[in-house]
């Protein structure tokens, strides 16, 4: 373990549409590193356009680990990511290269670097039962249940946040212990030295414009057709984490007739901007970050200087 701590990994975090992938590819060209994706949308197969997955030309230059690894109908947790990422890091280091972790899923970064509590895995039967209860009695009734067994979590989780509410109840029903109690115990610390960068524009308007431009480009690349194909499957629905990804949810609802095309475009752009705002909030509270300005000419030199 002491020897492992000498090894460095580079992390490149940032909000959506901030230029992470472009900078990461330049790093691969100029530094002996391999990219590990830290993105909860890129893990899914058949979700290429709307997730801004690197294209074939980009992947030929800079292959990405941990993209296209699961079906959209399957579940994948932060604990799954931590396990998979640690294995990839070990493999890359064993081949004499530097791992470069790139993405905007801050929950994954937090799980990897700070460790995770030993929570039980998903239980399909219990999840189904919770869904039945929610359908019959409403999420407020389930929130009242959570107040009884885990008042601390109930105070933190809103009744209109079904994913987190269901998970807190699921943990209690599986383990007999509250989420609050279990999260006091952390898994083993991150065994590497992390050199951590964050990239974002200084002007929020620049990021907002980049988000709008990128989403409209996705529409030109066939995003609606991609969602139509996913929607034609009988095992996908809006309650799945994959279909709750920003853009996919709004497009699905448009195809369901909930609103017209123009409204879908507007809602998807607004939702993406809200995601970027949450990502930036996380990053501002993240320690030991070296900040980079999106599009700055010296970004590559800065990363190389700190990483060597």
UniProtKB/Swiss-Prot annotation:
State its Enzyme Commission number(s).
2.5.1.75
Q: Which Pfam families match?
A: IPPT
Where does this protein hold substrate? 16-21
Keyword annotations from UniProtKB, A to Z? ATP-binding, Magnesium, Nucleotide-binding, Transferase, tRNA processing
Positions that bind ATP: 14-21
Listed name of the protein: tRNA dimethylallyltransferase
One of the record's GO molecular function terms: ATP binding
The protein's annotated catalytic reaction(s) are: adenosine(37) in tRNA + dimethylallyl diphosphate = N(6)-dimethylallyladenosine(37) in tRNA + diphosphate
Role according to the record: Catalyzes the transfer of a dimethylallyl group onto the adenine at position 37 in tRNAs that read codons beginning with uridine, leading to the formation of N6-(dimethylallyl)adenosine (i(6)A).
Instruction: Write out the transmembrane intervals.
Output: none
Listed GO biological process terms: tRNA modification
Co-factor requirement: Mg(2+)
Tell me which family the UniProt entry assigns to this protein. Belongs to the IPP transferase family.
UniProt source species: Shewanella piezotolerans (strain WP3 / JCM 13877)
Q: Do you know which PANTHER family this protein is assigned to? A: TRNA DIMETHYLALLYLTRANSFERASE
Query: How does it associate, per the subunit comment?
Result: Monomer.
Location of the region described as Interaction with substrate tRNA in the Swiss-Prot/TrEMBL record: 39-42, 163-167, 244-249
Site (Interaction with substrate tRNA) residue list: 105, 127
Q: Does the keyword Transferase apply?
A: yes
